[in-house]
């Protein structure tokens, strides 16, 4: 057990310091914005320092563990720890939240509450990724929904209340299954309830019971990821939310579903995962094609990007279902890669909306000449989204592709068929990405906007865009930087399926 509570400080620091926002003077919003930004930067530096100096990459076991008894009656512990699987998403959370805070600079209405909710969400997400106790994982999972709901319902488009209600109904419905699964696993087969991940990972269940648990967790994570048909909240939510909230949703929230699938469904329930993995692969392939073919029909720019996110999540599902080292590494790389790409696309969609007050592509056109910087950034990020070689999306999708082809668990013909379907999805992706660029930036100027709106990206917006673009290029050129974090843990997880 770790002597100094690094992880507890990392989890609690944003919400504790965030609650002091309400004590700051009300003279303008600048003090509060800088205060929030400083908290995010401090938290990111603290996390990076802890992982650099106290985390061994070659050890697949849980490190920096903390174990404090919390509720004596229920044997409930505040149990934290990280391994190769959680280190990437935690660093991604810190990076995206810091940039989302900077992106939220124009927010002036109820700015104190807005920034506090962003910091509360930050704590909940890091808590979810670093929990080593199932009930604590559930509590963090639920705690993080409250700020998201308030961010969606209070700031955004005209239909924001509808989309926020839809979001909370879907996620709360999924959470019921998550709670039943958590309590079922914790109370099964022993006199004393245990919710410790390490203990549960070595416990075996009757296959029928394991399948029931698996389905419960799968529904909860399928809503968050999202897996079709649980995806309909996502386009509505992204279409209405403020773009800084969209960055957090696309960059981190969706990845929590993928993380849960690997952490709980794969690690704790390997027999059921073997049974369900062919189904996951089929659903993933259908999802890639379905979302990629639905996206070109969306005239709302943010909804089109939302459907592209759903399509990219299909690769993560296939990687998780492939039961191979390469496939799972590809899925984890896609989690990180799409976190940057999705956040950057929504940020640029939001900055273009700030200028022209339009979201519908058929009303846009000819923006390349008045907004050259925005045009350049959005073009490069669209290329990253369609998996251009040299950018992070390409490496992740290629690894998933190789992972399914080299998997030892499937016959040759099904593997070829799935690879063919994935290839069709990869061909459909440029269709909606490039048509989006064509409708926005080329052709005649269709909209009537006074010229004073037409200033190109300022220093703040360029800084956020470039900060998101650099990791995308970096991972594309040297993917081992991210893969080295998780490769040992992935081998440990996959070995369960071959030696158990």
Swiss-Prot record:
Name of this protein: NAD(P)H-quinone oxidoreductase chain 4, chloroplastic
The enzyme's E.C. designation: 7.1.1.-
UniProtKB keywords: Chloroplast, Membrane, NAD, NADP, Plastid, Plastoquinone, Quinone, Thylakoid, Translocase, Transmembrane, Transmembrane helix
GO biological process, one term: ATP synthesis coupled electron transport
PANTHER family linked: NAD(P)H-QUINONE OXIDOREDUCTASE CHAIN 4, CHLOROPLASTIC, NADH-UBIQUINONE OXIDOREDUCTASE CHAIN 4
Protein family per UniProt: Belongs to the complex I subunit 4 family.
HAMAP family in alphabetical order: NDH1_NuoM
Location(s), subcellular: Plastid, Chloroplast thylakoid membrane
Reaction it catalyzes: a plastoquinone + NADH + (n+1) H(+)(in) = a plastoquinol + NAD(+) + n H(+)(out); a plastoquinone + NADPH + (n+1) H(+)(in) = a plastoquinol + NADP(+) + n H(+)(out)
Membrane topology: Multi-pass membrane protein
EC category name: translocase
GO MF annotations in UniProt: NADH dehydrogenase (ubiquinone) activity; ubiquinone binding
GO cellular component, one term: chloroplast thylakoid membrane
TM region positions: 4-24, 37-57, 87-107, 111-131, 134-154, 167-187, 208-228, 242-262, 272-292, 305-325, 330-350, 386-406, 416-436, 462-482
């Amino acid at each position: 057990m770790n002597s100094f509570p690094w992880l507890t400080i990392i989890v609690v620091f944003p919400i504790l310091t965030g609650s002091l926002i309400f004590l700051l003077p009300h003279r303008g919003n600048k003090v509060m914005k800088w205060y929030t930004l400083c908290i995010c930067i401090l938290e990111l530096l603290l996390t990076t320092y802890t992982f650099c100096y106290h985390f061994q990459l070659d050890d697949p076991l849980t490190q920096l563990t903390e174990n404090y008894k919390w509720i004596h009656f229920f044997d409930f512990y505040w149990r934290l720890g990280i391994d190769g699987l959680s280190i990437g998403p935690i660093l991604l959370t810190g990076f995206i939240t810091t940039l989302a805070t900077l992106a939220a600079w124009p927010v002036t209405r109820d700015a104190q509450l807005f920034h506090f909710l962003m910091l509360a969400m930050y704590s909940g997400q890091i808590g979810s990724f670093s929990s080593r106790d199932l009930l604590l994982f559930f509590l963090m999972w639920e705690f993080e929904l409250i700020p998201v709901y308030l961010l969606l319902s209070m700031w955004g488009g005209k239909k924001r209340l509808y989309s926020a209600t839809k979001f909370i109904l879907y996620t709360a419905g999924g959470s019921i299954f998550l709670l039943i699964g958590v309590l079922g696993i914790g109370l099964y087969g022993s006199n004393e309830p245990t919710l410790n991940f390490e203990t549960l990972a070595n416990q075996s269940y009757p296959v029928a019971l394991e399948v029931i648990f698996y389905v419960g967790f799968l529904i909860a994570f399928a809503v968050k990821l999202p897996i079709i048909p649980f995806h309909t909240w996502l386009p509505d939510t992204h279409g209405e939310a403020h773009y800084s909230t969209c960055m957090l949703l696309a960059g981190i929230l969706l990845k929590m579903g993928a993380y849960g699938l690997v952490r709980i469904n794969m690690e704790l329930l390997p027999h059921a995962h073997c049974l369900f993995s062919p189904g996951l692969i089929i659903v993933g392939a259908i999802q890639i094609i379905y979302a990629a073919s639905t996206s070109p029909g969306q005239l709302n720019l943010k909804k089109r990007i939302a459907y592209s996110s759903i399509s990219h999540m299909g690769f993560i599902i296939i990687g998780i279902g492939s039961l191979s080292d390469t496939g799972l590494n590809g899925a984890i790389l896609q989690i990180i890669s799409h976190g940057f790409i999705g956040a950057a696309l929504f940020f640029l969609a939001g900055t273009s909306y700030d200028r022209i007050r339009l979201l519908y592509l058929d009303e846009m056109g000819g923006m390349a000449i008045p907004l050259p910087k925005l045009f350049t950034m959005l073009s490069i990020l669209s290329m990253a989204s369609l998996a251009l070689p040299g950018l992070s999306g390409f490496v992740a999708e290629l690894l998933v592709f190789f992972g399914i082809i080299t998997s030892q668990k499937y016959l040759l013909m099904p593997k070829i068929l799935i690879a063919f379907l994935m290839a069709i999805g990869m061909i459909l992706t440029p269709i909606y990405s490039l048509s989006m660029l064509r409708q926005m930036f080329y052709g005649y100027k269709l909209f009537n906007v006074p010229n004073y709106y037409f200033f190109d990206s300022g220093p703040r917006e360029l800084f956020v865009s470039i900060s998101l673009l650099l990791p995308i290029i970096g991972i594309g050129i040297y993917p081992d930087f991210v893969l080295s974090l998780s490769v040992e843990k992935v081998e440990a997880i996959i070995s369960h399926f071959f030696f158990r």
